[in-house]
Structure formats: structure tokens, C-alpha cells
Amino acid sequence: MDAEFVTNFDALYIIIFQIIVSSVVMRMKPLKSMISGFLVCSIGMALTLFSQNVLFTLVAILIFSLGEMAGSPKITEYIGRIAPHDKKALYMGYSFIPVFIGNVFAGIISGVVYQNMADKVMITRQFVAEKGLHLPDGLSNNAYFEHVAQQVNLTPHELTNLLWNEYSPSNIWMVILAIGLGTTLLLYIYDRVINKTKR
């Protein structure tokens, strides 16, 4: 099953389950729903990187989607609640500043982390260097990978499994989970400490 097809299951799950999830979380306070949603999201996202098994990944995407459905809509509701009546539009606009900052730094930080821990091309190049293999220059990533597989008498699928077992790129799930748990913890502290003083 193609990776592009598998990622579409997130949208499918949202179409199927959004009304059910919304009916459950609508009774919850926005921050409680956001904390719960982001926690479930983090677990789901981490699990998608834990295994190569497609069915396992589909279940992990479902977990992620449920968290996304529980947490994301409540962000807008929370902004609407804390904003003064005459400044709701201004607050809504400002609420996208963290998203902008996150997108900028995520590209810089996550790219380096992913490349060092889980990028298939980088892992393959490391494997080539360790084995002392020699390959022609100017190959595309796919052609490079196929040439490496040929030189070690493996199919591309077998080489993928070998790299997965030897270099453990799935360990990046720990980074994803740590970020998610950190975010959830900060929201919890905000709810219990900072937000409590404003009530």
C-alpha cells in the first residue's frame, strides 16, 4: 500500500468520526479537551513511527485522528472565550502567531533531527560508507537505493528491513512523543497555575 494512500486515512477517519467525537467533547471545557486531545494525538503520532506494519499504522493514525478531532476545534472555542467581546477578531488573528513560529522552527529543527535519526537516504549512505561500497555519481535517491540493494544481493524491500533492524529509525517516535507530552504538560500547568490565578 502506497504511503500517500495511507496518509489519506486521517481525513477518512475525521469524516467518519468527527460528529461522534464532537458530541463527546462538547461537554468538556476547552482546555481539558485540548489537553486530552493533544495527549492522544502525541501517542498516535508516535505509534505511526513505531512499526512498518500497515495495519498497525492505520490504527495509530486512527488514534492520532481521534486526538486531533478532540483538541483542534476547541482551540478556536477557547480563544473566543478568553477574548474581550470587542476584540475577538484580533485575538483570533494573534492565535495564529504560535502556528507561524511553530512552522518556521519545525522546518529547521525537525529536518535536522529527522535526517540524523530516520531519513532513509542518510541511513543508506551511512550503510554504504560502513560496508565500503562504491556507487556511481549522479544517481537519484531511488536509483541509489536500488544499486545498494544489488551490491549486497538483496531486494529493495529486504534492504529496507535490514536498515530498519540495524539502524532503528523508528526511535524517532520517542522524540515525537516527548514533544507531545511536553506540550500537554505545559497546557496542564497553564490550566492549573496561570489560568487559575485569572479566574
Regions found by a protein language model. Give the residues of each.
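Loop-to-transmembrane helix entry
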Residues: 1-13, 55-58, 168-174
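Helix-to-loop junctions at the C-terminal end of transmembrane segments
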Residues: 16-30
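Structural signature of the two symmetry-related core transmembrane helices
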Residues: 32-47
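Symmetry-related core transmembrane helices of the 12-TM Major Facilitator Superfamily/SLC fold
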Residues: 126-134, 166-192
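Loop-to-transmembrane helix entry/capping segments in MFS-fold secondary transporters
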Residues: 83-98
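Hydrophobic core of transmembrane alpha-helices in multi-pass small-molecule transporters
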Residues: 55-71
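A gly/Pro-rich, aromatic-decorated transmembrane alpha-helix motif that marks the paired
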Residues: 100-120
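Intracellular juxtamembrane helix-capping segments at the cytosolic ends
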Residues: 69-84
